[in-house]
Amino acid sequence: MPDATRRRASTNRKMDEIMRPARRLPLTRQVLADQLETATPAQMEFVDRWMNAEIESREASKRTRLPGQAGFPAAKELDDYDWQNVRMPADWQRSGLESLGFLDGPEDVVMFGPPGTGKTHLAIALGRKACRQGVPVRFYTAAGLVMRLLRANTEGKLDRELQAIAKARMIVIDELGYVPIDEEGSRLLFQVAANAYETQSIVYTTNIESGGWGRVFGDPNMAAAICVLSSCYRPVWREFSFRKSGRF
């Protein structure tokens, strides 16, 4: 057997020996630090490249995985969105929305307008952009979220469900106001909003202005409490409207 072939075979065996325990062992920083104490510059350069490659691989896998976990009903993007029917608040520009800067606050966003004006498209597109930036997102219709919470509560799994929702940095609650919510559903939806305080952004799409949310929840006090959580305790309550157009 030629020397080059033998060396290659020996290298392959050594790589297999390294990979077997690597699949079972999480990285321990102290062990790594101890080994780096006696590492040569070349060895340290190798470890540095390895660490960065591992981080890049994990981030790429996360960005690929997040859109599927979010629960988007369709693949909508900002590139093909028509902004001409959107009326932004006087103190807020479109760039503030497209940049996802509201996630840094965190701030809530309310998209208000008649059915069929592109609110859901925009909410999905923002959520998908957030996913591509490594931000965990969850998408629900208001009715679907309430049903999910009610079922979890009945099965004694409410805490687990709320913990799952809390893992997202951005929550989209679509079609708020299309279906009335009873007292128990209102209480559970308020719990989601309360848990999100100062840690998550909620994007609402609705056909009812925030002042009329009492009709949706069947409880004006509960509706007011949700509005207070978003508009007073958070830095900004972003409510902007859509006008009906033949395009949608």
Feature locations, PLM:
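Conserved phosphate/pyrophosphate-binding and hydrolysis machinery centered on Walker-type P-loop NTPases
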Residues: 8, 36-44, 71-72, 84-87, ...
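Conserved P-loop
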Residues: 91-167, 214-217
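Walker B motif beta-strand of ABC-family P-loop ATPases
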Residues: 170
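N-terminal pre-Walker A segment at the start of P-loop NTPase domains
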Residues: 76-100
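Interdomain "pre-motor" coupling segment immediately N-terminal to P-loop NTPase/helicase cores
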Residues: 20-74
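Charged, compositionally biased N-terminal leader segments and the immediate start
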Residues: 1-30
